[in-house]
Amino acid sequence: MSNLTLDVHTADGSTNGTVDLPSSVFDVEVSTPLLHQVVTAQLAARRQGTHATKTRGQVRGGGRKPYRQKGTGRARQGSIRAPQFTGGGTVHGPQPRDYDQRTPKKMKAAALRGALSDRARHDRIHVVEDLVPGQTPSTKAARTFIGRLTDRKSVLVVLGREDVNSIKSARNLPNVHILPSDQLNTYDVLNSDDLVFSVEALNAFIERATGAETKEESK
């Protein structure tokens, strides 16, 4: 498989060279079950898991027998905090728990490659030199530039951590999500319609992704 070549767009509307997307990262077979498993694990890990209900032993009150055992014609009861009473404890209710699912690193990496490949095949990856011209942050300029690249609703912008100018320019835009290249993940790729990479962030991601593949092959 040959590498995919994309133009590098500039903020003034022109292009400045091209970049190659390695086929080993951006042109692989997509496994829907793998994507589902990895995304499910990601969303599960975000859950706090602090939900809790009180059992009959934790509800306040109910220490005294509500009425005598015999002679009333009613069913015997030992506490007004038993589960069948209003205000009583909960039976088998949710308790605090950890929702984390163990997902091997190779599965996460394979899912991310599959998600990126899907976006690349549908021309939904764009590469920019800088998000805004000059050294002054401008939300208006960032909105205009992204609007020229894509008219889709949700956009994921991948930037370098040191690119403070671009981060400040795009962070308040609605439906635009910003990530550093080292935090790129399957869920955010699939949750966005289009991806916009800065050249710096794209090169850093490719270097890390292809370097990890080389290490795996050498084992």
From Swiss-Prot:
InterPro entries: Ribosomal_uL4 (IPR002136), Ribosomal_uL4-like (IPR013005), Ribosomal_uL4_dom_sf (IPR023574)
Presence of the UniProt keyword Phosphoprotein in the record: no
GO cellular component terms, semicolon-separated: ribonucleoprotein complex; ribosome
Keywords for this protein: Ribonucleoprotein, Ribosomal protein, RNA-binding, rRNA-binding
Functional description taken from the UniProt entry: One of the primary rRNA binding proteins, this protein initially binds near the 5'-end of the 23S rRNA. It is important during the early stages of 50S assembly. It makes multiple contacts with different domains of the 23S rRNA in the assembled 50S subunit and ribosome. Forms part of the polypeptide exit tunnel.
Oligomeric form and interacting partners: Part of the 50S ribosomal subunit.
HAMAP family in the record: Ribosomal_uL4_B (MF_01328_B)
Listed name of the protein: Large ribosomal subunit protein uL4
Lineage: Bacteria, Bacillati, Actinomycetota, Actinomycetes, Mycobacteriales
